Amino acid sequence: MKREILLERIDKLKQLMPWYVLEYYQSKLAVPYSFTTLYEYLKEYDRFFSWVLESGISNADKISDIPLSVLENMSKKDMESFILYXRERPLLNANTTKQGVSQTTINRTLSALSSLYKYLTEEVENDQGEPYFYRNVMKKVSTKKKKETLAARAENIKQKLFLGDETEGFLTYIDQEHPQQLSNRALSSFNKNKERDLAIIALLLASGVRLSEAVNLDLRDLNLKMMVIDVTRKGGKRDSVNVAAFAKPYLENYLAIRNQRYKTEKTDTALFLTLYRGVPNRIDASSVEKMVAKYSEDFKVRVTPHKLRHTLATRLYDATKSQVLVSHQLGHASTQVTDLYTHIVNDEQKNALDSL
């Protein structure tokens, strides 16, 4: 989604919200949470507060009038009723007879509400230096996680990774083979952003950074000589991330054409740009997702930028057998998250043994 459109939608949702949600928004913007994350949270709050009005828990006329005391006095039974409502209500704007939303969607809603409740009960300060209230009902609400072993998850994910020679093969395909399949009109469009697209995909494959971390990079965050980028991790923490050497020529090619191709001024600090009506703008996450999906589907299988992160992590573990090193590269505080890659690599080793 374009940044301008995203901000417009955020403003519309903010106009609906109670004052304490607006305070929460400002606080998280300073962390900083991304606008995309805050937009998704505001959508969840809109859904929740609409239910609060519909169910009669609050007799306010509109969402913005719902008092803080409603959240303070919300019972566990009330919250469970909301979960049942979300699970059983008909799907909106969908050509299906299926009832309710997925457990993943419900968990996302509960995560957003947990964040709001934590802010109100622990993080915010009133004039006396105390939180607005202390009772956090969300701590009593359990969430159901999808039951899946690491082995099963590894099996599901490994077909969507570009391992071994496929990493370089994917980049070579975009650079050399993909253009041959295009019409003259499509080729002209492709050539306008070819260097940028290759640089972004190479960086994702060579560093394992999250999509949000990549699109938020500024020029000053890239050190080509050292092949290091400085990123803002989740929670607003700054981190220096090493980048594999194979990405360097793609980054150099992009930087060589960046200023002229995208008509930059000194104020255009974003590393990766797009032209909109002749004006350079920071590329947004949605554009990168569509780009990765298009190229990957033509090459092998449709994937997301997060699968490129998994690709780097798997290759790095295969080369080092160090979960600590992989967790540091990905910006994880614990090695538990990297257990997945040991299962994927074990499958690769089994396949190699079977071929002997």
From Swiss-Prot:
The protein's job, in short, is: Site-specific tyrosine recombinase, which acts by catalyzing the cutting and rejoining of the recombining DNA molecules. Essential to convert dimers of the bacterial chromosome into monomers to permit their segregation at cell division.
Give the primary localization class. cytoplasm
- Which GO biological process entries does UniProt record here? cell division; chromosome segregation; DNA recombination
Domain named Tyr recombinase is located at 169-354
- Name the residues that span the membrane: none
- Which superkingdom heads the taxonomic lineage of this protein's source? Bacteria
Keyword Cell membrane listed? The answer is no
Descriptive protein name: Tyrosine recombinase XerS
* Signal sequence segment: none
Active site residues of this protein: 210, 234, 306, 309, 332, 341
From which source organism is this entry? Streptococcus pneumoniae serotype 19F (strain G54)
Q: Which Gene Ontology terms of cellular component type are present?
A: cytoplasm
Keywords of this protein's UniProt record, alphabetized?
Cell cycle, Cell division, Chromosome partition, Cytoplasm, DNA integration, DNA recombination, DNA-binding
Q: What does UniProt list under activity regulation?
A: FtsK is required for recombination.
Q: Which GO terms describe its molecular function?
A: DNA binding; tyrosine-based site-specific recombinase activity
PANTHER family, alphabetized: PHAGE INTEGRASE-RELATED, TYROSINE RECOMBINASE XERC
Gene for this protein?
xerS
As for family, the record states: Belongs to the 'phage' integrase family. XerS subfamily.
Record-linked PROSITE patterns: CB, TYR_RECOMBINASE
Domain Core-binding (CB), by residue range, is: 16-121
Q: Where in the cell is it found?
A: Cytoplasm
